[in-house]
């Protein structure tokens, strides 16, 4: 790349010189560009080595003194056709990088090259890759998000690879680690359409999610192969399906729709003092009911203490023995079903406990369907 860079550099400098008044070079930058531009172009090409891209954009950071000098020239002389040095330089660098690499210039690029002329450095910022899909959680005890590293409390240490989080035991970590390898990404973030409790399974067609892969050096992969590898490594724990490339906009759509989706739950309910088949028929009174639910005590540490109104659409049940029955509930997303059963000491009403007149609690919970349009 030595000679192509030199040839292009000469062309760029000639172009800049052609816009400089004759007799002594550039009074604006004092020769900064001629001294630094070649070195920084080579650094940019070095940053791009081994990175899979189809588009790029340049960004420029100039020393404050150059900006001040440019402002004084404008104020004192008001040149009619004077273009901003930053804008001009950005356009020239876009052309240069595109010519040297064959990458197209885009306003929504795969990467941005930041040319810092104050420090004489170039930084490559890689746009995330977004992958949409659904996950099924087949075992209890798996969280959706990674947990803080117990060694450092989230600050980052050698034990957690300086991430502050541990991948083991979470959907985000199990799925994200495989995707990170395929895309040579630095890190990842899972964005889900809501979340289930750690001790709940996510069954049926699965929960929609978007995985955001940060600073990926690869941008393409066979997603069927990615899917297969995730399911192989996580056999019996989780499954993913229907993986497809997506965009950041999908995250916003998931988050906006999540509180409004309907969800179907299966709960194993235990009743103090036992329950008869006829008593269970009373639970049909929940169908169509609007539930007044104050934030459950168990999540007050992370949720505002407010009252939410959620609707139950359908209720079915199956008696197992004198003290247990299965409860199937179709309801609004965001309804805490464990508290719909227990009543949470009156914070949720009506509840199974209230209707039966007997203390009831949920010993198992499964999400059977997340009905996202």
UniProtKB/Swiss-Prot annotation:
Gene Ontology BP annotations: tRNA pseudouridine synthesis
Binding site for substrate: 265, 336
Enzyme class: isomerase
Catalytic activity reported: uridine(54) in tRNA = pseudouridine(54) in tRNA; uridine(55) in tRNA = pseudouridine(55) in tRNA
EC number: 5.4.99.25
Cited InterPro entries: PsdUridine_synth_cat_dom_sf, Pus10, Pus10-like, Pus10-like_C
Family: Belongs to the pseudouridine synthase Pus10 family.
Task of the protein: Responsible for synthesis of pseudouridine from uracil-54 and uracil-55 in the psi GC loop of transfer RNAs.
PANTHER family: TRNA PSEUDOURIDINE SYNTHASE PUS10
Protein name in UniProt: tRNA pseudouridine synthase Pus10
Taxonomic source organism: Korarchaeum cryptofilum (strain OPF8)
């Amino acid at each position: 790349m030595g000679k192509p860079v030199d040839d292009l550099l000469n062309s760029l400098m000639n172009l800049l010189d052609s816009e400089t008044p004759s007799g002594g070079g550039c009074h604006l930058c004092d020769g900064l560009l001629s001294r630094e531009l070649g070195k920084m172009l080579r650094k940019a090409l070095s940053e791009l080595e081994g990175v899979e891209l189809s588009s790029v954009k340049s960004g420029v950071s100039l020393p404050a003194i150059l900006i001040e000098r440019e402002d004084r020239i404008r104020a004192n002389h008001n040149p009619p056709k004077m273009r901003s040095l930053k804008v001009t330089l950005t356009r020239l660098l876009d052309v240069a990088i595109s010519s040297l690499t064959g990458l197209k210039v885009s306003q929504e690029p795969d990467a941005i090259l930041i040319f810092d002329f104050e420090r004489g450095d170039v930084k490559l910022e890689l746009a995330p890759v977004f992958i949409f899909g659904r996950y099924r959680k087949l075992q209890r005890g798996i969280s959706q998000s990674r947990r803080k590293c117990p060694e450092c409390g989230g600050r980052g240490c050698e034990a957690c690879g300086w991430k502050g989080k541990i991948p083991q035991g979470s959907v985000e970590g199990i799925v994200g680690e495989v995707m990170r390898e395929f895309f040579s990404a630095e890190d990842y973030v899972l964005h889900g359409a809501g979340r289930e409790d750690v001790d709940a399974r996510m069954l049926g067609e699965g929960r929609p999610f978007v995985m955001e892969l940060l600073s990926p050096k690869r941008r393409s992969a066979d997603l069927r192969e990615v899917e297969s590898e995730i399911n192989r490594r996580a056999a019996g724990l989780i499954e993913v399906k229907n993986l497809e490339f997506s965009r950041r906009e999908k995250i916003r759509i998931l988050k906006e729709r999540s509180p409004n989706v309907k969800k179907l739950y299966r709960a194993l309910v235990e009743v103090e003092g036992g329950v008869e088949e006829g008593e269970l028929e009373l639970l049909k009174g929940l169908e169509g009911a609007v539930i007044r639910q104050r934030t459950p005590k168990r999540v007050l540490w992370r949720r505002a203490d407010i009252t939410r109104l959620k609707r139950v659409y359908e209720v079915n049940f199956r008696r197992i023995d004198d003290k247990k029955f299965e409860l199937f509930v179709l309801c609004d997303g965001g309804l805490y079903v464990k508290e719909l059963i227990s009543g949470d000491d009156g914070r949720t009403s009506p509840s199974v406990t209230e209707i039966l007149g007997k203390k009831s609690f949920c010993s198992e919970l499964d999400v059977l369907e997340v009905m996202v349009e």
